[in-house]
């Protein structure tokens, strides 16, 4: 069955008037009957299952149809509250623990995920310690649909302020969760699952920096332990390579997923430990740099795109450029990489040129300013700040030979240099001065033109 069937209509069964749940047409009696049948089905098969191996079993088609209706209906708040009152979380927990059927586990976790969208049921679910333990253990389940629903349940609970701390504490107490999430990111090709796991990690790291750092630091400890103790011991999966693997897969499959994982990488670079994890990887961050550079130069803000593309890509741009900028100033191999930063000069200049066009349009539309417009202005300013900082660092490191090559390849032009001056001055005057000195050795005419422009901008 590829999708959940629609809920039964009110004509499916005659029921007393007071049998309805809240203001819905759903029958309490029908819920009682369905859940009771489900309990009997699981309990009835338990004794025989104990005598056999842990072989997965199929779910009865008719019963699957009925509990899928419960799954659909649990998105209704009245139904979710009724299920809470009926002790459904405890019932579903018991079924999940006993279940030998992947589809049944998926549906039960899905019902809990729907219920957790509402405050009171979410509180009940979150305060159930046994349920919390089982939910985290399910992240090691081999069934992708079950993993998807489990990730959705955890993300929904983490998004509820009243219980987010409870769940964060559970994550801290279960280091195996990190390993399971890394395994999913590194090995799964399921786009929906990777997106949900990314959203879960993004939420978790954003709300709990200490947890993020502890998971990253564990990579350093385990890497040293494997190196020192056993040549034949398989190295544990590290967080950064796993994040990169998922990001690469989602690049062409899910813009939303790509945005999510880039934001996680951005969160890492806001800390020294996170930055070290990226730039001190075995390859010195080469694979990460190559991927992010290629993404910037070939996917984002392309020459034929309209200027407003920066508004659509503002989140992607702010994250990817922030990570690249941090890597650039943090890596020992920076000077060896200068030649490969030349295409980034073109990309950064294009971003700044498009931002200038957007700012002109925003100025013209000031009379119609709204909260959404002001929010756009804020995020566009973030993109500008990150772009300027990164560009200033690149320009300040260029040598005469780098500039000559940049000119010959078309990455350094008068138009792009003028755009850089308009945006970098006066804040990055030292970087501009350093660039102009090197430029003077490579192209005196262009350097003189820019020097005059610098004087005008300084006035």
Curated annotation (Swiss-Prot):
<feature type="compositionally biased region" description="Acidic residues">
    <location>
        <begin position="10"/>
        <end position="21"/>
    </location>
</feature>
<keyword id="KW-0539">Nucleus</keyword>
<protein>
    <recommendedName>
        <fullName>Protein saal1</fullName>
    </recommendedName>
</protein>
<comment type="function">
    <text>Plays a role in promoting cell proliferation in response to pro-inflammatory stimuli.</text>
</comment>
<dbReference type="GO" id="GO:0005654">
    <property type="term" value="C:nucleoplasm"/>
</dbReference>
<feature type="region of interest" description="Disordered">
    <location>
        <begin position="1"/>
        <end position="21"/>
    </location>
</feature>
<dbReference type="InterPro" id="IPR052464">
    <property type="entry name" value="Synovial_Prolif_Regulator"/>
</dbReference>
<dbReference type="GO" id="GO:1901647">
    <property type="term" value="P:positive regulation of synoviocyte proliferation"/>
</dbReference>
<comment type="similarity">
    <text>Belongs to the SAAL1 family.</text>
</comment>
């Amino acid at each position: 069955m590829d999708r959940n069937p629609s809920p039964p209509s009110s004509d499916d069964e005659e029921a007393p008037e007071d049998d309805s749940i809240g203001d819905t047409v759903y029958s309490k009696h029908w819920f009682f009957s369905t859940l009771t049948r489900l309990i009997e089905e699981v309990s009835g098969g338990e004794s025989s299952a104990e005598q056999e191996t842990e072989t997965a079993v199929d779910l009865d088609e008719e019963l699957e149809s009925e509990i899928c209706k419960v799954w659909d209906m649990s998105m209704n708040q009245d139904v979710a509250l009724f299920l809470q009152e009926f002790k459904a979380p405890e019932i579903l927990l018991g079924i999940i623990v006993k279940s030998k059927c992947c589809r049944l586990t998926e549906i039960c976790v899905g019902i809990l995920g729907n219920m957790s969208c509402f405050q009171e049921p979410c509180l009940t679910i979150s305060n159930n310690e046994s349920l919390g333990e089982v939910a985290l253990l399910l992240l090691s389940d081999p069934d992708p649909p079950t993993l998807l629903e489990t990730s959705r349940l955890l993300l929904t609970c983490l998004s509820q302020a009243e219980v987010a701390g409870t769940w964060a504490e559970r994550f801290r107490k279960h280091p195996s969760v990190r390993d399971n999430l890394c395994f999913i990111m590194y090995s799964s090709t399921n786009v929906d699952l990777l997106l949900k796991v990314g959203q879960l990690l993004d939420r978790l790291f954003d709300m709990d920096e200490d947890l993020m750092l502890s998971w990253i630091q564990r990579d350093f400890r385990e890497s040293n332990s494997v190196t020192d103790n056993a040549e034949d011991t398989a190295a544990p999966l590290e967080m950064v390579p796993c994040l990169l693997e998922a990001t690469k897969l989602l690049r062409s499959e899910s813009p939303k997923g790509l945005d999510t994982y880039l934001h996680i990488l951005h969160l890492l670079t806001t800390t020294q430990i996170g930055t070290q994890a990226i730039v001190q990887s075995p390859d010195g961050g080469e694979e990460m740099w190559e991927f992010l550079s290629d993404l910037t130069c070939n996917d984002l803000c392309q020459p034929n795109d309209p200027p407003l593309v920066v508004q659509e890509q503002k989140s992607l741009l702010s994250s990817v450029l922030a990570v690249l900028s941090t890597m650039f100033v943090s890596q020992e191999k920076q000077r060896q990489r200068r030649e490969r930063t030349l295409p980034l000069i073109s990309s950064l200049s294009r971003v700044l040129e498009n931002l200038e066009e957007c700012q002109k349009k925003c100025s013209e539309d000031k009379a119609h300013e709204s909260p959404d417009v002001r929010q756009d202005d804020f995020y566009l300013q973030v993109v500008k700040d990150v772009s300027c900082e990164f560009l200033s660092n690149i320009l300040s490191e260029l040598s005469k030979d780098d500039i000559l090559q940049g000119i010959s390849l078309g990455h350094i032009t008068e138009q792009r240099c003028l755009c850089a001056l308009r945006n970098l001055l006066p804040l990055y005057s030292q970087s501009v001065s350093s660039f102009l000195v090197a430029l003077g050795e490579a192209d005196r005419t262009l350097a003189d033109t820019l020097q005059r422009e610098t004087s005008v901008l300084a006035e």
